[in-house]
Amino acid sequence: MGSRGWLVSAVVGSMLGALTSIALAQDPATQSFSAPLELAPPPAPDSVDQDLIDAAARPAGILKYGPVSLIDPLWDNFNKTIDPLGLKVGLAYTAVYQAASGGPGRRDAAGGDIDLFGDWRLLGEKGGQNNGYLYFAAENRHDLGTGIAPSALGGQIGSLWGTTNGFGEQPLVLKEVYWQQHFGGDRLIVRAGKLDPENYYDSNHWQSDSKYFLNKAFSSFPVRAFPGQGLGANVTAKFGEQMYISTGVQDAQGKKTEAGFDTFFHDFNLFGAFELGFTPTIEGWGKGTYRFTAWYRDAGESDGKPHDGGLVMSIDQRIGPNFIPFFRAGAGEGNINGIEYMVSSGVGWQGQLITESDVWGVAAAWGRPEDHDLNDQYAAEAFYRLQVSPDNQFTIGYQVIVNPSFDPDSHVVGVFEMRWRISI
């Protein structure tokens, strides 16, 4: 059996197994759905679910009002008007500036990202256990007058991976649109449509360059070569109170800027992943999420990219109400991103500092290139995120990149960073 046959058989088999197990666990005569289960795994930091939660929170800042405070009542009234229709909508704008201390190319970059996102309950009642939702997310990305956007800065300074995970340049696109069907609350969730695989496999509490760390070693994990948003399906099933699986297949040549019907139905090159996760609550510490993921990606007939695959793990564990350390490790073939092994670890704080909801984090990473003639690369980052007003967050931070793999003449490169995010 070829790699594609193994991929399809393994993932589809696990999806069917999850569906069957959940179905057998539901006895219509005895099963009660009065208490919905907590989502497992927790929503990824950049998922539509989490973006809606963050937009609605509006925690107090050092200022009572901010640049968009006049819009808040109008946006609130709009969401109240559409709420009876089962519709929720959020809007965010994030701007980033980075300046490097060295490197062979350009040394500063600025970019912006505007996001419109939401979900629409089209099946079931509010608070129901078997509801169906249409999810959507649109995005525009652009530079801010520096000649390059932040996504290109890593290549300019010879880094093995990016100084950000996103913040490139693209027109307005519908990057995600999919159906999400719940069975028994959050015990079983089936998704189908244009999906972002980073939201369903090998996520992490701190995995967001719009909200937390910027360096790609922490805001993503580039030892894994996941494709962009593409057509496919995902099944997430919860077993008991502390175990889940997340598995699925989608277009290996997915791109957020393209619908993907040609590559999915004509080429049928697939990406598949299987994740086993645990969500224990440790007495005296708090809740954690422990993820173990295997993935494989077919070679692309249209984009010419080679096949790739690997194993990754991602752990984040609360220690008390504020500290959340994390650890990630992975190994892959390195055929696409050029990284064979990678480890990252760090800690963050969420809670009372200057304001009640400030965040800081510090982390370090190591990566080994697939080309062993290149240097192993190390990176570290520290940041502080201040809640300026209920809608506005300001982040300042610094990255250190040691032995950038593609610039052997540089031993250490620093990257200063600032970020402003507005979310309503």
Model-derived regions, located:
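Outer-membrane beta-barrel "beta-signal"
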Residues: V412-I424
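Residue-level signature of outer-membrane beta-barrel architecture
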Residues: K80-I82, W120-K126, Q180-F183, K194, ...
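N-terminal periplasmic/intermembrane-space "pro-region" immediately following the signal or transit peptide
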Residues: G13, T20-Q98, G105, R121-G127
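Detector for outer-membrane/organellar transmembrane beta-barrel domains
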Residues: G277-E370, A382
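Short loop/turn motifs that connect adjacent beta-strands in outer-membrane beta-barrel proteins
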Residues: P28, G66, I71-V89, R121-L134, ...
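Surface-exposed coil loops of outer-membrane beta-barrel proteins
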Residues: G147-Y178, G185-F271, E275
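Transmembrane beta-strands of outer-membrane beta-barrel proteins
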Residues: L87-L91, N130-A137, L188-R191, A233, ...
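Transmembrane beta-strands of outer-membrane beta-barrel pores
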Residues: A95-A99, A138-L144, K194-N199, V249-Q253, ...
